[in-house]
Structure formats: C-alpha cells, structure tokens
Amino acid sequence: MNIYVEANPYLHDKYSKYADEKYKREGNPFVSFPIHFDDIPSGAKTLALTFIDHDAIPVCGFSWIHWTAANIPAYIGELPEHASEERQDLMIQGQNSFASPLAGSNDPKVIHQYCGPTPPDKDHAYTLTVYALDAELNLQPGFYLNELYQEMKEHILAETSIELLARV
C-alpha cells in the first residue's frame, strides 16, 4: 500500500501554520491536505488514518494528535483537499489534541476534525499513517485514538506511514 501527499519538502502553507487567516479556526489551520492511495490490498473495505506530531513530546509532554479518521472507503483512491470538513460523508473523525487542557478548545469543528501543524519551537516531522482494514469500525464521532487502535485490532491488512515536515 502506498500513500502520497504533496510536500516540497514542507507541507504546503495552506495546511499548516502559515495558512491564510481565512483557512484558520481559533488560530489553527483547518483545511486538510489531499491524500492519494494506491496498491490497497484486496479484501480491504475501509481505511483509517492518524496524523501525529511526535516532535511535540519535548514541548508538551506527549505526542500531539492532529487528525484521526476511520471508515474511509478503501476504493476511493484519494481523500480530497478539505475532506475533513467538506466530505464528512467519506469518514468518521476522532478527537484530536486540541481538546486537551493545553489547548482547551471545545469547538467540534476544531477538536473533531483536521487541525493542522503549528510547530512552536522548530520544524517538526508529522507522521501520517494509513491502515487498510477488512471491516468497517464500530466508532462514534469524536472517538479517542486508543479506541481507534482497539477497534483496528484483528482487522489491519496493511499499514504504511510517511513523514511530512511543517516549518516553525
């Protein structure tokens, strides 16, 4: 399985810290980047994804979750730009770290959708992982990352990750 995201070498400004203000909510970028998929294993029914900043550990003490999504149809080939908000019919989305006490948001459009990179201290590498699954997962909107991992057990046919850079 392969995933492709345009980055040269950084994620485009529109999806990260330097997004135009019209693409920000509570100061954070909300337009999700397009993701292309190919070589999805036969037998895959859905895809799930995580977009996590492990470089945040020295800053806040834990890996920062920017986006989680599940039940993406395995046949789609691409999750289009801004799908997190404009194509919610393609997925169910989980809670990100902007709901934590460090960020303190309670706006569902911030905490239950893509909320892009805003590295505070240096360039960060963000890990996008996509999972091919043999089932639709039993999750509710706003699920937690641990619930996603628990539901995926026994259903992962393939997984792949890429690192995407965002500039300070």
UniProtKB/Swiss-Prot annotation:
Disulfide bonds: none annotated. InterPro entries: PEBP, PEBP-like_sf, YbhB_YbcL/LppC-like. SUPFAM superfamilies: PEBP-like. This is Uncharacterized protein YxkA. It comes from Bacillus subtilis (strain 168). The gene is yxkA.
